[in-house]
């Protein structure tokens, strides 16, 4: 669902940091 997409985006964001 949408929560899954949000979690993915957060994971990618923290990866970039």
From Swiss-Prot:
Coiled coil: none annotated. It comes from the Eukaryota. One of its GO terms (cellular component) is extracellular region. The keyword Secreted applies. This is Caerulein precursor fragment-related peptide R2. The modification Leucine amide is found at residue 17. Expressed by the skin glands. It is found in: Secreted. Belongs to the gastrin/cholecystokinin family. The lineage of its organism: Eukaryota, Metazoa, Chordata, Craniata, Vertebrata. GO terms for biological process: defense response. Keywords: Amidation, Amphibian defense peptide, Secreted. It comes from Xenopus ruwenzoriensis (Uganda clawed frog).
């Amino acid at each position: 669902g949408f929560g899954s997409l949000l979690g993915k985006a957060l994971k990618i964001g923290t990866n970039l940091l």
